[in-house]
């Protein structure tokens, strides 16, 4: 790091976030862990041991883990690499390292009521009878895309974040169909738009231009 000493700018070694966290009662979370480069991941591997220490070669120093230091990571692929093509840029994680994670759990899509609660908490203007009905239908569309993805019917899926953006865009454009197109449908494969439009029609009772009923033969 560049620091000022005696009115002069000098470069000196400063401990980064990982060495600092190890020595303190900190819960350190690595987001998108499976996007890390393999050479970086090996640095972390030693820390994953139950009493793993961290060596700072620049200072010839060995750091002891604080008793209450904890490390967490989030991934999209559980370390197995991207088999779907949805998470380009992720890496396979060394199985020796995966073996050192003593707890692994999966967070699936939220229950309907919880997803509804989150969307409404971020969109206060829709926290009324009409708004709740629209949000409920948005979540139903999202659920159909998730089932369609699992069944192999479509290759793009709506996450809770997508539903949140859809609700936000509805508040801007005041048109639920247009908001759906610019939020999600425009990101989808042309060959799948008809299927996704059918999902929308089932939940809202309205046809989008991409729907099969509007396709002229």
Mark where each language-model region is.
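C-terminal regulatory/interaction module of P-loop NTP-utilizing enzymes
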Residues: 1-217
């Amino acid at each position: 790091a560049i620091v000022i000493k005696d009115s002069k700018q000098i470069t000196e070694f400063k401990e980064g976030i990982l060495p600092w966290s190890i020595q303190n009662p900190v819960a350190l979370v690595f987001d998108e862990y499976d996007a890390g480069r393999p050479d970086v991941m090996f640095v972390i591997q030693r820390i994953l041991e139950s009493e793993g220490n961290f060596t700072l070669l620049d200072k010839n120093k060995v750091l002891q883990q604080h008793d209450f230091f904890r490390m967490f990571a989030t991934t999209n692929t559980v370390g197995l690499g991207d088999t779907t093509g949805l998470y380009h840029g992720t890496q396979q994680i060394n199985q020796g390292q995966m073996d050192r994670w003593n707890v692994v759990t999966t967070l699936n899509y939220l229950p309907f009521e919880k997803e509804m609660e989150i969307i409404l908490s971020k969109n206060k203007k829709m926290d009324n009878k009409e708004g709740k009905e629209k949000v409920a239908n948005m979540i139903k569309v999202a659920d159909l895309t998730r089932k369609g993805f699992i069944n192999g019917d479509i290759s793009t899926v709506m996450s809770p974040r997508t539903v949140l953006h859809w609700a936000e865009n509805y508040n801007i454009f005041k048109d639920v169909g247009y908001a759906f197109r610019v939020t999600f449908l425009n990101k989808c494969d042309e060959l799948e738009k008809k299927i996704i439009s059918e999902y929308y029609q089932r939940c809202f009772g309205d046809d989008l231009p991409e729907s099969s009923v509007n396709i002229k033969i």
